[in-house]
Amino acid sequence: MSGILYVTGTPIGNLGDFSPRAAETLESVDFIAAEDTRVTLKLLNHFGIKKPMVSYFEHNKRERGEIICNRIEQGENCAIVTDAGMPCISDPGEDLIKLCEERGIKTVVIPGPSAVISALAVSGLETGRFTFEGFLSVNKKSRSEHLDSLKNEHRTMIFYEAPHKLPQTLRDLYSFFGDRKLSIVRELTKVHEEVIRTTTKYAAENYADGSLKGEFVLVLEGKKQEEKSEEYTLEFAVQTARKLIENGAKPTEAAKEAASITGFKKNEIYRELL
């Protein structure tokens, strides 16, 4: 009988956030797939858990994923963890989930802390709709294309960033998006946790000197609805809604989605659909 892969969340800084269910899961499985076994060993030692581990990270995920799945198919249970937070989110564990799906292996989630959701919650920005953009590429062309594709994004945007890349990213956000609200969230759940609610302009001028230290989540205000892009017309908005309807969306849902894309009011688009 095949085993189970447990997708297990770990603390993002404060060990007190490790849930009893997560601890019980790591205690009960046959082995643990860890992004960095040295980091996970510290967590296990803190909670007195002794369990064999295998490394599973970006550069060995293809070969190691097959080995992990083979062991699960032979009846072993495995927990996958990342260094901090939920595995499989902006993380090579995503590929292991896909492999499990292909091979019919059952997966169970053991929820834990999430830097994305935690940062959004304290950002002071709109939380109803948001998009997680992960880390921006270090490649200048790819980075520019990524940011350029978000210029008309109305939803709140969330980025991860490393300390050594933060200065350039702050300058880029102001360059591509103009002056918008920005929350710089650093060292979540740790001793020096801080939420800096500012603007892209102020951040580019005052925080791009490399003085801020730690791990960062950047939460950026989306484009305001009234800022209609010149490239969109009402006709385009209505056509967009009609395509959504053809694909199975209800008229009200289609109008709402087309409004979020083009900046026109939902009711304005809906009237044209009737």
Where are each of the predicted segments found?
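A contiguous loop/helix-start segment that scaffolds small-molecule binding in enzyme catalytic cores
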Residues: 2, 156, 163-274
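Short glycine-rich anion-binding loops that position phosphate/pyrophosphate groups of nucleotides
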Residues: 12-13, 83-87, 163-165, 223-225
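Loop/turn-to-beta-strand initiation segments
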Residues: 3-5, 75-79, 155-156
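Class I SAM-dependent methyltransferase SAM-binding "motif I" and its flanking Rossmann-like core
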Residues: 95-153
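Short active-site oxyanion
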Residues: 26-32, 105-108, 156-157
